[in-house]
């Protein structure tokens, strides 16, 4: 079995009205090792429909998308990349809607590649739910795990989703024990974080005034 961990950035939240402006997919073998990667920028055809906040978050600008592909060029690349793979995404329903909208808008009929995917939100709920995590966004999970801040760029977020997928899949007793250890470490780190500056200040004072 092969997987494609993926993320999309869009001009808003409504598939079939807003548009996908970037896609990243990381293809994995059965051992969850990366074997290929696809990063595509897509030129929006109906920018007047775009949500300004969505464009701000994903960093869209005409100059940064000057080399973007037209939807007719991007769709076959994405379709071929995903073929015979199980999709993996953080909120798969959202990404699936925009990929399907792109395929249908460009007249593609090979929609069977959009098979049922694996949602890392569901995996996260199963793994972190018992520990009272209040949000299952990539940003919240990454913050708890001490990962770099989410950038809302397709490739960066796909890399983060891939790391989360490797951490949580497949769910097993071994994985559960690993998660328990990670959450415990995160809680300890969270308790200590507010005191780091104070400890650094005390250490500096000690070095300057207490040592002989």
Residue ranges and their predicted role:
Residues 36-37, 122-125, 168:
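A short, structure-level motif marking secondary-structure boundaries and short turns
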């Amino acid at each position: 079995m092969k997987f494609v961990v993926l993320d999309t950035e869009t001009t808003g939240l409504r598939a079939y009205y807003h548009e996908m402006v970037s896609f990243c997919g990381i293809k994995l073998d059965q051992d969850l090792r990366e074997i290929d990667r696809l990063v595509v920028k897509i030129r929006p055809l109906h920018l007047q429909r775009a949500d300004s906040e969505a464009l701000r978050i994903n960093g869209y600008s005409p100059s940064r998308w000057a080399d973007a592909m037209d939807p007719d060029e991007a769709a076959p690349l994405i379709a071929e990349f995903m073929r015979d793979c199980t999709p993996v995404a953080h909120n798969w329903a959202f990404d699936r809607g925009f990929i399907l909208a792109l395929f249908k808008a460009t007249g593609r009929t090979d929609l069977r590649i959009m098979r049922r995917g694996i949602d890392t939100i569901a995996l996260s709920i199963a793994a972190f739910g018992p520990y009272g995590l209040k949000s299952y966004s990539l940003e919240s999970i990454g913050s708890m795990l001490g990962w770099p801040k989410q950038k809302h760029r397709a490739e960066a977020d796909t890399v983060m989703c891939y790391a989360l997928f490797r951490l949580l899949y497949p769910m097993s007793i071994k994985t559960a024990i690993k998660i328990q250890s990670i959450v415990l470490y995160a809680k300890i780190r969270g308790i200590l974080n507010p005191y780091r500056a104070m400890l650094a200040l005390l250490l500096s004072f000690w070095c300057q005034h207490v040592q002989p």
